[in-house]
């Protein structure tokens, strides 16, 4: 069968394997690429290619991540797999690998383990919207009742963290047997591919979301007015549309009277483009870096939120010492730093470099935010942590 050329016409979906150490996440990743490439075209990735994950930097944090891709008849998948537990924590919190869905791998021989729970909780906190379960190593369990018991346990655990545990797909398989070419177990990988296709909805593209442009710079052009520049985060801005300026100060409304890119005038600016937006009747000192330009009513400013946070270790260039109650670092959202006071959870006295935890923050100025927004924690310009807004509290 001839290899198909890469079709950009297929919808693109981001997924990843999550779950306890040694439950077979990387073996499953290899099995998916091997079986699906044999069935639908594409290229297989061997276990050691995936396991030897390259390091990458996200928000100043080094993370080891393997990226593979594969196709089903209707979709193209980009899939991330991390070698170590700490890499998962960092990956999920920084959003280095934004997942439209997660494949939770649970060994039938062990059932749910501490990291199984931790990854489900993290998935809930950082906003992984859909989870599919692959029960691995089922070839090593002869007792049908035991398999049912493990499946029930996993479903209950997912319910506990507000995933629809009773309804989501659970596939019982063996990644190793599938990788070795055993036809009975290969079928289970095909089944997993079908579950990805049917259970994870097509993600909304950045361009279809409401317009947001984080402001990086402000200029005044004599005779024309004020121009703000930045990279359009999502959506489209058209000349003549009303926009809101949100964050830091009170929200104000204005109209976009021009869009330019590389000194050329355009009718619109789109997600991913670096543009200048001319604002009608807005004075130079009424806008500043750190605010966002947004579709009216689509995003609101907040000061109080709960966050899931990873604190950099000393080796990663983070703090050398723990921090305590009353910690007041800067929180870097999109384009600017805002000081905030940290409220540690009950019973937590201090936080060590390398920890991950949930805490509350009160900023000294409001920032345009929604749940799922990523930020860095900084001290005097140096990154000491990364976080994601898991819940807005005001």
UniProtKB/Swiss-Prot annotation:
Residues 136-139 are annotated as: G4. GO terms for cellular component: cytosol. GO terms for molecular function: GTP binding; GTPase activity; guanosine tetraphosphate binding; translation elongation factor activity. Residues 81-84 are annotated as: G3. Mg(2+) binds at residue 26. Transmembrane segments: none annotated. Keywords: Cytoplasm, Elongation factor, GTP-binding, Hydrolase, Magnesium, Metal-binding, Nucleotide-binding, Protein biosynthesis. Its EC number is 3.6.5.3. GTP hydrolase that promotes the GTP-dependent binding of aminoacyl-tRNA to the A-site of ribosomes during protein biosynthesis. The gene is tuf. Residues 60-64 are annotated as: G2. It is found in: Cytoplasm. This is Elongation factor Tu. Monomer. InterPro entries: EF-Tu_GTP-bd (IPR041709), EF-Tu_GTPase (IPR050055), EFTu-like_2 (IPR004161), EFTU_2 (IPR033720), G_TR_CS (IPR031157), P-loop_NTPase (IPR027417), Small_GTP-bd (IPR005225), T_Tr_GTP-bd_dom (IPR000795). The keyword Magnesium applies. It comes from Alteromonas mediterranea (strain DSM 17117 / CIP 110805 / LMG 28347 / Deep ecotype). Its main location: cytoplasm. Pfam families: GTP_EFTU (PF00009), GTP_EFTU_D2 (PF03144), GTP_EFTU_D3 (PF03143). Residues 10-204 form the tr-type G domain. Residues 19-26 are annotated as: G1. It comes from the Bacteria.
């Amino acid at each position: 069968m001839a290899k198909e050329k890469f079709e950009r016409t297929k919808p693109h979906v981001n997924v990843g394997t999550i779950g306890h150490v040694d439950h077979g996440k990387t073996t499953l990743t290899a099995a998916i690429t091997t079986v699906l490439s044999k069935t639908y075209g594409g290229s297989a990735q061997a276990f050691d290619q995936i396991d030897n994950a390259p390091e990458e930097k996200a928000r100043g944090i080094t993370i080891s991540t393997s990226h593979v891709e594969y196709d089903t008849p209707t979709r193209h998948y980009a899939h991330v797999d991390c070698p170590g537990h700490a890499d998962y924590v960092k990956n999920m919190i920084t959003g280095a690998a934004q997942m439209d869905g997660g494949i939770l791998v649970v060994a039938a021989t062990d059932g749910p383990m501490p990291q199984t729970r931790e990854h489900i909780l993290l998935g809930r906190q950082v906003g992984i919207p859909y989870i599919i379960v692959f029960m691995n190593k089922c070839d090593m369990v002869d007792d049908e009742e035991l398999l049912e018991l493990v499946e029930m346990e996993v479903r209950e655990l997912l319910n506990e963290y507000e995933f629809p545990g009773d309804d989501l797909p659970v596939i019982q398989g063996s990644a190793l047997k599938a990788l070795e070419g055993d036809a009975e177990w290969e079928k289970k990988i095909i089944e997993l591919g079908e579950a990805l296709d049917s259970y994870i909805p097509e993600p909304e593209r950045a361009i279809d979301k409401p317009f947001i442009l984080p402001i990086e710079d402000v200029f005044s052009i004599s005779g024309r007015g004020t121009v703000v520049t930045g990279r359009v985060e999502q959506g489209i801005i058209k000349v003549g549309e009303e926009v809101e300026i949100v964050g830091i100060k009170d929200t104000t409304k204005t109209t976009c009277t021009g869009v330019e890119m590389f000194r050329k005038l355009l009718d619109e600016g789109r997600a991913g483009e670096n543009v200048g937006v001319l604002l009608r009747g807005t004075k130079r000192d009424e806008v500043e870096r750190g605010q966002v330009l947004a579709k009216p009513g689509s995003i609101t400013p907040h000061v109080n939120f709960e966050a899931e946070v990873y604190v950099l270790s000393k080796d990663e260039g983070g703090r050398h010492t723990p921090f305590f109650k009353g910690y007041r670092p800067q929180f870097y959202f999109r384009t600017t730093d805002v000081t905030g006071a940290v409220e540690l959870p009950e019973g937590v006295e201090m936080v060590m470099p390398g920890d991950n935890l949930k805490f509350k923050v009160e900023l000294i100025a409001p920032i345009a935010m929604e749940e799922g927004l990523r930020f860095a924690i900084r001290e005097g310009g140096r990154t000491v942590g990364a976080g994601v807004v898991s819940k807005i509290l005001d």
